[in-house]
């Protein structure tokens, strides 16, 4: 009989006053008993809408049934038949707007905690089994994957399972893409990402780092080297700024740079050689998950005051509610309906404040959200010594500029057809390189679709 409790089984977390001063993972995960209890809430629907809400089509009721039975290994095998990275998606996927939003238990009460259960299964397997996947017999056909973020890793894994000889070309010195440079340790421990990369290598995937495609090699040169198809999953790492006065002052930086220094280069550790700005008061401009990540890192790096400055209201914030909740618990102050108009500096060329104007919401704009309108005469100044711009990112133009015939849209995203083929034959693309900055799970879905399309293309 199903567990008809209306609320999710709570997941243990570090206390806010403790975690705000360390980079250890905030969410501690379910115990086996908690997972089995929560799995009992699943009704095992005959027509599961939750599966329709999953971009990688995990057979959700099936794996949850195995969790309820205590057969965690079988649950893992069900998940990984369609999801190559469950330990990652279980942590950072916005389940509340995807699979869990379709759960019928959410009609009266809370949905089943699908993400927490997926994370539990992946963690249990890593801690108790961690068998490396077997290598599929190679068909001898070479495929190149540019980028090792969620799209690239998923595409490479699916192609390797089909027998292709896959090589990943990663620009940075560590594989993982946004998973290692963008998402903080307290949300996604890097050891977990490294373990997923080791699994890929066990499948026979070659992972080459420090390989900037467009500089070290071009797409055309990859074809000359014998690769029969290329998947571009290079992400969207080009930060956006506001173009307001004062953005060139010392103490203004992009969230992309700030998070890369903190996460990838581990600048928060005593032994790190990478410098990272140490601040007393920080304004993070933006309202997405990246803004929350940057603000929470600033708090952990010793800032006394951290502000989220966002031009719309909290209801319009794109950040996950969980991330907003955690940020507030950790003492971060939200300055909503505020828009920066100038960054102020002293004679030393350093930031000493940010001038903002208060906003009100008008009619919806093209995004579907109500358009913010400045309130005349409402300017005020926040005393800060650091401003972090978390306004989104766009794809880097390097690959496009070095690949004749590769077209992009006005936002820099690669143009693809329904099969993720770009305007160059044999070159496929997916994830943020196409859509601009989006979620990890959508990038994984694009990588999965790209692998299937490449397989079909090479079999023609």
Feature locations, PLM:
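Local cysteine-cluster metal-coordination motifs and their immediate loop/turn environment
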Residues: 40-62, 86-107
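Rossmann-like dinucleotide-binding cores of NAD(P)H-dependent redox enzymes
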Residues: 168, 172-203, 207, 295-342
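N-terminal Rossmann-like FAD-binding beta1-loop-alpha1 element of flavoenzymes
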Residues: 141-167, 291-299
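A conserved FAD-binding loop/helix module that cradles the flavin
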Residues: 294, 433-459
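Glycine-rich dinucleotide-binding loop and its adjacent helix/turn
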Residues: 121-137, 195-215, 241-301, 408-419, ...
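FAD-site-proximal beta/loop scaffold in flavoenzymes
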Residues: 248-279, 364-437
């Amino acid at each position: 009989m199903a567990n008809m409790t209306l609320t999710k089984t709570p997941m243990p977390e570090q206390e806010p006053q403790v975690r705000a001063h360390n980079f250890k993972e905030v969410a501690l995960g379910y115990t086996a008993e908690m997972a089995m209890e929560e799995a009992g809430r699943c009704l095992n629907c005959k027509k599961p809408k939750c599966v329709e809400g999953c971009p990688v089509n995990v057979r959700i009721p099936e794996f949850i049934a195995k969790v309820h039975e205590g057969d965690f290994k079988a649950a893992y095998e069900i998940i990984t038949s369609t999801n190559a990275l469950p330990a990652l998606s279980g942590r950072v996927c916005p389940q509340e707007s995807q699979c869990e939003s379709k759960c019928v238990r959410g009609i009266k009460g809370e949905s089943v905690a699908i993400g927490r259960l997926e994370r539990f299964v992946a963690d249990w397997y890593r801690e108790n089994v961690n068998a490396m996947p077997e290598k599929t017999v190679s068909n001898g056909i070479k495929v190149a994957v540019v980028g090792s973020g969620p799209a690239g890793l998923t595409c490479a894994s699916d192609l390797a399972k089909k027998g292709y000889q896959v090589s990943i070309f990663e620009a940075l010195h560590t594989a993982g893409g946004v998973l290692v440079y963008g998402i903080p340790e307290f949300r996604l421990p890097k050891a977990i990402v490294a373990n997923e990369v080791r699994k890929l290598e066990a499948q026979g995937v070659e992972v080459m780092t420090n390989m900037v495609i467009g500089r070290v090699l071009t797409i055309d040169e990859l074809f000359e080297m014998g690769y029969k198809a290329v998947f571009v999953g290079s992400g969207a790492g080009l930060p956006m700024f506001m173009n307001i006065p004062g953005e060139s002052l010392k103490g203004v930086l992009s969230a992309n740079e700030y998070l890369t220094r903190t996460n990838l280069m581990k600048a928060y550790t005593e032994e790190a050689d990478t410098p990272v700005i140490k601040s007393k008061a920080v304004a993070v401009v933006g309202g997405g998950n990246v803004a929350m990540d940057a603000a929470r890192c600033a708090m952990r790096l010793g800032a006394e005051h951290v502000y989220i400055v966002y031009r719309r209201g909290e209801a319009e914030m794109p950040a996950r509610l969980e991330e907003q909740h955690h940020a507030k618990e950790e003492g971060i102050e939200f300055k909503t309906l505020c828009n920066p108009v100038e960054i102020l500096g002293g004679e030393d060329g350093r930031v000493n404040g940010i001038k903002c104007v208060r906003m009100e919401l008008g009619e919806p704009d093209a995004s579907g959200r109500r358009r913010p309108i400045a309130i005349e005469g409402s300017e005020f100044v926040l005393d800060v010594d650091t401003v972090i711009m978390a306004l989104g990112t766009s794809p880097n133009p390097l690959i496009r500029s070095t690949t004749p015939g590769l077209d992009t849209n006005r936002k820099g995203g690669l143009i693809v057809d329904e099969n993720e083929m770009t305007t160059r034959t044999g070159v496929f693309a997916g994830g943020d390189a196409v859509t601009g900055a989006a979620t990890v799970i959508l990038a994984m879905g694009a990588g999965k679709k790209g692998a299937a399309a490449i397989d079909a293309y090479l079999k023609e």
